[in-house]
Amino acid sequence: MSVWVALALLGMCVSCTHVPPPRALIVSKEPPPALDSAPRPAIPEAVPLPSPVEEEIAGRLPPAPAAAPERVPESSQEREQKPESSKPQVVEPVSLASPVKPREAGSVPDVLPVPEVSSPHVAPPAPPAPTAPRPHRPSPPPVSPSASKPKQRAVPPSPPPASEPPREAEVQAEPEPAEDSPRAMVPEEPPEDEVPRVSRAVQLAVGQKLEVLYPGEGWVYVGEHTAQPGLRYHQRKLEESHSLFTFSAEREGDFVLAFSYFDVFRGDFVSDALAVKVVPKREGLARVVRAPEYRRTVSSPPDTVVSELSPAGTGTERRAEESGTSGSQRAAAHTGAPVRQDQTDTAVAEKAQHGTPRPDEKKDREPTVGGRDPVPSDAVAQGVSERYSPRKISPASQPSAPSAAPIEAHVPASAHKEGQEKRDHLAEARQFCAQGNARDALASLGDFFAQFPSHERMDEAWFLRGQAYEINGAQRNVRLALEAYKTILERFPHSPYWKKADERARFIKNFFIKIS
């Protein structure tokens, strides 16, 4: 390698130093000689030196095999000296169309045998190793199908079971809880299938609203017992520590409204029901009807009527003595039995002994529809089924012979008079307002408020009072008129006069800057 590098450097130096002499100083007329056309020596190309990494890799590689010597072409004499057997034989192709010629003796076969080439470097295949002969096993004898089945073992008979003692009943009756245990203190809810006890009844027409008032805040509405449409439930609200339920009549029929209340002192549920009869729609009736008031009695004698049909808005419980009849007479009235003379005399004597109640104490009167026309008690009682009766009458108090005694005989005559007085007061006040007579209108309304403080047409009375105070004259008072309209807006949200009262109240607030 170093020799080649030295030669390359020497050639480069020679080519650089071979410069012809300057000819500018030679003055000669002869043309300059031609440049030397002799070929210059070829400069060998520089071979890059291998890096140490390449040398290390080249040292690990195996040596390259030696190149095969070049074959020298044979001369014509050498070809002639070769034996004929070494010359290649040419096999003529045989066409399928031409017939096959028979072979001659001593002719060369069509297919030459391929001589076996034995290489001294290839070892002959080793013979297989001898295997040990397997021992001979005798074949098992043939098995018959009967012998293939497994033999069943003989099971000895089990001894008869010994008589076991009778076991006790798995389900035993649970012991009743003690009175002081927590389980005994938990109240049981009333069964759903139990028929509620009807304590009151009310009648209203289609389109009217029904208000049911219960004392206390724990009352809830359970549902309609007959499960028929026609009476729609609206809401429950608290009004001065009382529960007020609102319904509306949409279809005719007889309904039973069930209510429930939990008494914390007794630890039991109190159930109550209200019988409602919806009649066809009528004109000129009040929009809201108040159901009779609920009064619960702890204990009552057999001849006491727990609940009576009372007018809308003032229903009470009364005993047989208040109406001047005994329990036997009331039972006879409901069952149609005759009343003996001695029973009537006894009732009259009891009435004279206790005294006749004053008119202001008589709160029981006949049911009315919207406070307009009195409804006979037999019409209301007819709408209530016999199974909803509040109490069964003992057989001892039932006479034997039937009779037709009307129920209206036990209703005080003052009930009809009171209903007439209510209509007269409001009719007079309306007439006086139409005539512009505010003094007489306010006087009639004052008598109405004093005598009937819980009438179902109280909203109409308050509206007439506001109208009377707006009449021009000595009685004009805008502040009192505004208070009357506000009373309707706050206490009677379902009143038919609510919209008119709201309009008048807005008018007074907008057009009167200072109300004195």
Curated annotation (Swiss-Prot):
Provide ranges: composition bias, Pro residues: 122-144
Extract the Gene3D superfamilies matched here.
Tetratricopeptide repeat domain
- Which Pfam families does the annotation name? YfiO
- Keywords recorded for this protein, A-Z: Signal
Q: Where is the composition biased (Basic and acidic residues)?
A: 71-85, 351-367, 415-426
Q: Where is this region: Disordered?
A: 29-197, 296-426
Positions with biased composition (Low complexity): 145-155, 394-406
State the source organism's domain of life. Answer: Bacteria
For the keyword Signal, the answer is yes
Signal peptide annotation: 1-17
The identity of this protein, by name, is Uncharacterized protein TP_0369
Organism (species): Treponema pallidum (strain Nichols)
